[in-house]
Amino acid sequence: MAEIKKIGKFEGIYQPPIKADEVTSLIILLHGWGADAADMFGLAPILGQVKQGCAFYAPNAPYPCAASPHGREWFDIQQGENGAIMAMDDLDELLNSVFDEFSLPASQIILGGFSQGGMMTLAAGPAYELAGLISFSGALLTEQRLAEATVSSPPILLIHGDLDDVVPATALIDAQSHLEEKGYDVEVVLEKGIGHSISETGLDSARHFIDSHLS
């Protein structure tokens, strides 16, 4: 049964494994700008059941969103790259709190996000030896962490609609280029006729990615 769970300073919605009692892997999904944890938690039944023993956690971003009274943000969108760089400290804190909470190795955790959550995934995630990173309609705002790429740096799935009028699809091409240049293993799904949203096709791609990269 889903529950509100605080991990470190982050409060979010947690779904324990449905197919097992012991947590052997974890999917963390970060919501977009002006949304909250509930926005991503709807994906738990779809993505969280791919692997036996897999739990699902959707944290709320730490800051209230001025443009959305009930929403949250990872950083002020007016700050662009600088905002993403400053917010990486929050993601570091989140990941380290998760490691402590579940006693899981990074290699059993997938980090993903939608829109601004996808931006944060690509900003902070590459420095960790995670099982994988998934960005839905995101962008690579900063290359600060990419120099830390190693042989065991995580595989990355980029999913984007070609009709996205919020984060243009060119962001996918740009991210792919920079990530591959630094040696990352990147899989790209550019969906025709899809705007700024997560489609069934995108979810199928994410499920396959999770199945391939979580043991």
Feature names for model-found ranges:
Residues H31-W33, I109-F114, G161:
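Conserved alpha/beta-hydrolase "nucleophile elbow" surrounding the catalytic nucleophile
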Residues D165-A171:
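Conserved alpha/beta-hydrolase "acid-adjacent" motif
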